[in-house]
């Protein structure tokens, strides 16, 4: 069918966050997605898309999707369709009841890694403003917490330090324990473009991922380390950099805590 309007949205299949124009028709519960078109002005994808974001949107109108709120007071009860007003009021009253009985910290919120930044922000706002505590988390923390802690300790923020455009200036790309072509396909495409222009790729992974040898690109080096030896491998690299005086001293002085770097180097 022909779309009636386009709605700008963000793909949540992975962390790239590609911008799309969802071309739809109909209104309310009858809204139907006709097609997903990558946004040419999207900062992350610049008009590109992977097969998941472009075509895997059938769940939005799947016949098994629940379109109306339902309530059951015990696990043995049958589900009962209710209005949105009743569902929201019931949820709010139950949350208040639990807090009144077990204390303010008895309730928290956790978001899916499929949520956008804006959706996660709304959840933490609700938990802090309505529940009155800081019991908020996201399942993305399970994989991101080590990098978040390291970035926060080093740079003062747990966010990434580079944008996707920076890969286009990279001369050497080091991929450790990641599989960009499967996990972040649009970014992987930009990386492959740079590799075809002559950048070198080093893959450190027990697996022989697609980037090790793919059509038109292949890794300069593949280190198939044993599972669980990432820290040992990185420590060995750091040891060589320090002992063979390969560190960029000017960069260290400009970007690092000299005293802490000295203690680390001595270690």
PLM region spans:
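N-terminal export/assembly segments and adjacent metallocofactor-ligating motifs
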Residues: 1-244, 259
């Amino acid at each position: 069918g022909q779309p009636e309007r386009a709605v700008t949205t963000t793909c949540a299949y992975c962390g790239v966050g590609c911008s799309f124009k969802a071309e739809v028709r109909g209104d309310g519960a009858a809204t139907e997605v006709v097609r997903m078109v990558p946004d040419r002005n999207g900062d992350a994808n610049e008009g590109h898309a992977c097969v998941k974001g472009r075509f895997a949107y059938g769940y939005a109108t799947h016949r098994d999707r629940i379109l109306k709120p339902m309530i059951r007071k015990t696990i043995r009860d049958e589900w009962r369709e209710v209005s949105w007003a009743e569902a929201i009021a019931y949820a709010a009253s139950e949350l208040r009841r639990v807090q009144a009985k077990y204390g303010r910290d008895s309730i928290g919120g956790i978001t899916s890694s499929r949520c956008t930044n804006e959706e996660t922000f709304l959840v933490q706002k609700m938990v802090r403003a309505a529940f009155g505590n800081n019991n908020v988390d996201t399942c993305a923390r399970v994989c991101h917490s080590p990098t978040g802690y390291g970035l926060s300790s080093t740079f003062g923020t747990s966010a990434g330090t580079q944008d996707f455009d920076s890969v286009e200036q990279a001369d050497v790309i080091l991929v450790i324990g990641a599989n960009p072509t499967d996990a972040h396909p649009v970014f992987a495409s930009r990386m492959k473009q740079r590799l075809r222009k002559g950048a070198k790729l080093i893959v450190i992974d027990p697996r022989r991922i697609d980037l090790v040898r793919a059509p038109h690109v292949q890794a300069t080096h593949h280190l198939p380390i044993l599972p669980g030896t990432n820290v040992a491998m990185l420590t060995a690299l750091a040891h060589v950099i320090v002992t063979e005086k390969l560190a960029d001293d000017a960069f260290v002085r400009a970007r690092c805590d000299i005293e802490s770097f000295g203690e680390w180097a001595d270690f």
